[in-house]
Amino acid sequence: TTMTQNTALTTPRVVLLDIEGTTLPVAFVHKVLFPYARTHLPALLAQQSDNPVVVQALAETAQLAPGVPAAEQLERWMDTDAKVAPLKSLQGLCWEQGYRQGELVADLYADVVPTLKAWKAAGLTLAVYSSGSEAAQKLIYGYTEQGDVTPLFSAFFDLKVGGKRESASYR
């Protein structure tokens, strides 16, 4: 068999999208979202200490960094842009407050919404896979300059399915 026969292209059924640099500028995450979470995280930890998401994230932080105070470890992770589930969950909670209070609005690239709508109309399944939590992904697409575009997506995947560089995450 020739190389051409072995690499026949099939029509795609799913478009799996990342967020940063794909549907909105990387700068939005690094210059808006991350600083917002860093500023608001201490108050969130104090005010929502009984929130199950906070309790679980702090327990996971303690498991990943035994003997290090949680707030200190979270700061370290933010300093290094670590892709760890407990930090992402807590950042997501901070952002949820910001979006709901109108302090945060995602500005997607101009071609994103028309393209997503065209793909959806063509019968493609649209999904997101990002290191940001599933909840954070839904907030980004739920509070955009173009309105709520979450109905265009069929699925949202985060680090709970595995790392983006691990092939098993895509199975």
Predicted features and spans:
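Metal-dependent phosphoesterase signature
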Residues: 65-110
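Short, solvent-exposed loop/turn segments at secondary-structure junctions
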Residues: 22-23, 30, 95-96, 133-135
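Asp-based phosphoryl-transfer active-site loop
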Residues: 9-29
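Substrate-recognition "cap/lid" segment bordering the active-site pocket of phosphatases
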Residues: 133-171
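Short, compositionally biased "basic patch" segments
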Residues: 77-90, 131-145
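Substrate-recognition element of Asp-dependent hydrolases with the DxDx(T/V) motif
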Residues: 101-144
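Conserved phosphoryl-transfer catalytic core
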Residues: 27-76
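Short, Lys/Arg-enriched N-terminal segments with co-localized hydrophobic residues
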Residues: 1-2
